[in-house]
Amino acid sequence: MPEICPICGLPKDLCVCEEIAKEEQKIKVYVTKRRFGKLMTVVDGFDADLIDVKDLAKKLKDICACGGTVKKDSIELQGDHRRKAEETLIKMGFSKDMIDVR
């Protein structure tokens, strides 16, 4: 018996909850200054119940070739990676209209 999605009630192989969540979430990408004047790119606005934020952070860190962490459903990347993060999120299926880059 296949696993059932707790959100939509469909089998896991037919579940589209994550795809729908990617299209509907308002994501903010911005840069902040941290200690010693270092820049930190923050990608915020994910619903951790619908999207695997840790897996997404791993992919972003690999593509941007930087370090980073996940804190309170947001991803922090070391350095200024706003454009790369935006391009990567669009390639992963997030809607371009719902990504706000500052």
Curated annotation (Swiss-Prot):
Annotated GO biological processes are: formation of translation preinitiation complex; regulation of translation; translation reinitiation
Q: List the InterPro entries hit by this protein, alphabetically.
A: DENR/SUI1_TIF, SUI1, SUI1_arc, SUI1_arc_bac, SUI1_dom_sf
Check the record and name the PROSITE patterns matching this protein. Answer: SUI1 (PS50296)
Q: Which domain of life is it from?
A: Archaea
Can you name one GO molecular function term for this protein? mRNA binding
Keyword terms, alphabetized: Protein biosynthesis, Translation regulation
Q: Which NCBIfam families match?
A: PRK00939.1 (NF002096), SUI1_rel (TIGR01158)
Instruction: Give the UniProt family note.
Output: Belongs to the SUI1 family.
Record protein name field: Protein translation factor SUI1 homolog
